[in-house]
């Protein structure tokens, strides 16, 4: 959509203006003025677009056409900036005088064209009376329907019985913290239906009650007035002083209030000034529903949260059946053919466990013949039909996102349905596309700001959490099928993303492509074989089994490509030839190679000076030339497996570019680097390094790391692979920020308490000799939550996890993972004091014959 392109333009103009100021100084003040004008004008246009979208949704074709013009303008401006920035950098590198260069004159001419187009858009807006918009009538109708539903006698719940019983007990518990229950979850899960049934069941146990729909654009005065009328405040008291009289009454009454669909915390800040706290001696209760977990957390605390989940398949079919037959128990599947029943099950399954989708679909089917042919037609068109019925409810959550977060959400459209996506990938692709920028004066890194956006998407229940890291951060996530459909539709509508199927046979659409994903090798080969013009392409995702993928790509100059992701899914190792034309992708910022890929990046990579992330999967064997260090913006170099790190790119020969060519403030991840290329001055130089892996650690490296002052200070993750027994004592006690430590050694190594960082949360030991001395040290680590021991040798057959006389043993440990132990036959913990927080014991790999004490047996199931 237009606002997404405008956001990208604004962010890129900020970057270019900063580069001009730093690199060229007063010499280019006139050029910086043009960039600043672009930035200001795009901000104003974006504000107008955000308001105008409501009128577009209402069906105003004039606004729709105007927004299309604005979108095309924003796209052309982005193309201009992407083409212009590399020329600034090249000109600066070779000390050309920009003012006299031809491209600077060309840029000035393009700016004048843009100014004329802006004036023309404003003329059209005024000429055809396309004025600023009022509230969208459709939204008002939707809000009114929700208010009616809130008071309707609809209390049938399917698949939520356990949730209902749990919440009922919680509400009637006298010790309920804050007196608040927060029902949260993604749109369509039945939060309001469940809350209504709870409210109606318990309200007779209170002196007064009220239920209010809050909405996305609430007015505190109207909400308080609604509550006052329902709890019995007299008209006179309302007219005298609504707030004071309402608060006074609620202080002495035992009440229950349901606040449905709260979108943000600001409205609660207004309401709580009047509504007294529920945890008073009176014993009042508050039920809230929200799409945003952070809202519930803010109002009632963490303990108030109750997150609804999609229905299981049988419960989905049960609800589907009830809605098909209008809850008439006398009419069921008894007279239906087995084929029709199976089609019905498939239709219910396509709804993804979302009650709203099931209800909408059943409503469509009730208006059709109950035949296999009619239902099959619905099944075949499920994606569109269900989406149409749920679109407004789901789209409200999207429209509520901050403008800057919307392209981040749409990025999920590039992935297949139900695909687990690493947070690291999303964060760095967002940064590569300039969706995330650090404003001047903000000391936080772009990665931190991007992580905030991801956390917000999860809190709003638009994205589902898949895995967390050792320290509670999001490790991976996925998007629900129904929301994925919405995401894809929105992305295609705005020309944000397409598949090859969408644009085949239409050269005009192909030429406008900005992001494309291939899931099929045949489609990919046919598409590239059609010789498409891909001059505007920014992002290319290829999920493929074809080793010749790079040969297909060699026919094109992806001069504006920012992001390239190649996922090779075949089971065998495939050698790929990456041609030298790979170096023509001079705008490339993010490169990810995943799967069984074997090959070498060409020396022309030296031209990819804007690369920020290189991510090589553990299954890939990719050699990097030394030219990679010419990418002075490089932030993350990730070899997921240390076996790949024996790589020529790490040479520090003075004849080739090397790691010292990098800007010292940029590099954050270096995983792995061979120790023979590791020097003391390197660590002192890389001041923002957060993740470091060293292969073949030497005594000199141990000595460097064990100094009293941490180098670097920002280090959070450290992985060390030893090939020999170090004579130097490891001392990492001066690294307070390290929370994850991985040690791999083939020989015996003595470690005392000073070997470990004071705040370590996750520790992995590989091929260690584990004895009682080492175990005694591990037991005392105060913040250790996860301990993983892989292929370790045990010089004692029995590993006793209990503490000494004082019982002090693994005070924070939650997960103990033992993989393929050697020489271990028994693991015991004979008291209830040791490991008080242990939740799980994992025995994996070859571990036959290991006996466990009773407590550990329960935790290993």
Curated annotation (Swiss-Prot):
GO molecular function: ADP binding; ATP binding; ATP hydrolysis activity
Cell compartments where the protein resides: Cell membrane
Protein species of origin: Solanum lycopersicum
Family matches, as InterPro entries: AAA+_ATPase, Apaf_helical, Disease_R_plants, LRR_dom_sf, LRR_R13L4/SHOC2-like, NB-ARC, P-loop_NTPase, RX-like_CC
Subunit (UniProt): (Microbial infection) Fails to interact with the tobamovirus mouvement protein of tobacco mosaic virus (TMV).
Protein name: ToMV susceptible protein tm-2
Lineage of origin: Eukaryota, Viridiplantae, Streptophyta, Embryophyta, Tracheophyta
Family per similarity comment: Belongs to the disease resistance NB-LRR family.
Binding locations of ATP: 185-192
Membrane topology according to the record: Peripheral membrane protein
LRR repeats: 225-248, 305-327, 388-411, 449-472, 510-536, 585-608, 609-631, 652-680, 689-713, 735-758, 781-804, 810-835
Other remarks on this protein: The Tm-2, Tm-2(2) and Tm-2nv alleles present in the tomato mosaic virus (ToMV/TMV)-resistant tomato cv. Craigella isolates GCR236 (AC Q71BH0), cv. Craigella GCR267 (AC Q71BG9) and cv. Yukang 2 (AC Q5MLE9), respectively confers resistance to ToMV but not the tm-2 allele present in the ToMV-susceptible tomato cv. Craigella isolate GCR26 (AC Q71BH1).
